[in-house]
Amino acid sequence: EKYLYKSLREAQLSYENPLDGKTPNPYHNALHGADVFWSARHLTLALRSELRVSLKLNDNPNVIFDISIAALFHDYKHCGVNNYFLIRTKHNLAMRYCDRAVLEHHHASEALRLLDRTKVTENMSYKRRSEFRKRVSSIILATDFVRQNESADKVEHIFAKYLKAVRGNDPKPELHLPSFQDTCLQNVLNLIVECCD
């Protein structure tokens, strides 16, 4: 708990003190991080209670923790410009991340580095830490505007069968859903944070 508080406090300070150390970011700041966090939490809990299928949300507190962390840190250390600008100006970040989802890679990398440094992941097993890092980075990377429709298309396809079964008064519409393996769950989590961002 104290480690999480330390990382959240450091993240808040980072949002308040931008990379250039001069100009506060008027949009990608601590308030935006908190707004996306609360919106994602609300949407996740609403999905959990409204759907007749668990999405692995009911029985897995790790999922709620992971999406919460991803939402809070999705714009961590944002420099106040967009990917296009970074690529066009040949910024070091663009070079580091090969012109692909530059800011999102930066946010994910820096967030995971902070969480490790502040020992948030210290007591996680190797398997859990790996799952955490994969889930959080995937959610943050999905906030890239270039990929905005990717998660939506995947989730729409999955739920089309489910909705058809519900509208057809099928007594067990959940049988038309694939078992919610990690890939499907990940797409739903990605979409939640994309919508909230």
Locate the predicted segments by residue:
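Acidic/His-rich, divalent-metal-binding segments that scaffold phosphate/diphosphate chemistry
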Residues: 1-101
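Divalent metal-dependent catalytic cores for phosphoryl transfer on phosphate-bearing substrates
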Residues: 55-196
